[in-house]
Amino acid sequence: MNQPQDDIRVAVPEPARRSRWQRFSPSMGWRAFWSEIVIVVLGVVIALAANEAVQEWNWRNKVMDGEARLQGDITWVFLWSAEKSVTQPCVDAQLAAMGRNVLESGDTLRPLPIGTVLDRQWLVRMPTRPYRFPVWEALLADGTASHFPPQRLAILGRISHDMAQARAYEAQTRDLDGALLVMRDPIALDPVVRADLLTNINRLRSLSGTERLYARQRMRMIADAGNAPSDAVVERFLNADGKHPAGSDYSGVVHFCKSRGLPIADWRDYREVGFTVAAPGEGIAK
């Protein structure tokens, strides 16, 4: 017996399950799709590489420009150090004479003569310099310094540190020199005053000797790095014959010492100093 038409059920086949990748089918086809992806990725890589190359080129140019500007500052550091080294024996001789004056004076100090240079009074004629390294400070501030080669970075960093130390020593020297100006007057000498004067004199002698050692080390380091000025430039700055007026461009202390028969050193003796900026075990002192 036939069933009614309404009872006839037609089985509809279920669609086959497709993987996630199969469900996604780009309209241009897979080959074209992956070609587009590769092109985009390559474009990004090339753009990044080009940007990095431009940045590297810019930093390289900044380093080259910085090196050119640094040479002037390095020359001044060498010249100031040479002046400090040459005049230290003269400074020490002046201080030794002051000490003898204190010891040999009776109850009243024999006053010492005062000198004046560029409106500055002094009892001890010694170099006075700014001891600055401004170009390197600027290169540190704008980030250029970090792109210098490691060995060069170490040398320039050491010079910068030495200049900061030299400024600190200069401040101490001026304080002691100012305190000793009292020796221009015939002051009463009791044991306490006599001891204070001798203490300040000997502190200044010790400070001067330490500065000479550091000055010679700086000169050696700069010379070994190939940045030392010529002998003619050094001799002209030291101005031993007094042909040029004392000031920022020429020393007046060397001529002062020489004209009074006070001892001076040879600026070239920095070559006798052993010095290196390498880390322990990485280099041999020269």
Language-model regions, residue ranges each:
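Long, hydrophobic alpha-helical segments that serve as membrane-spanning/inserting helices
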Residues: N2-R31, E52-K286
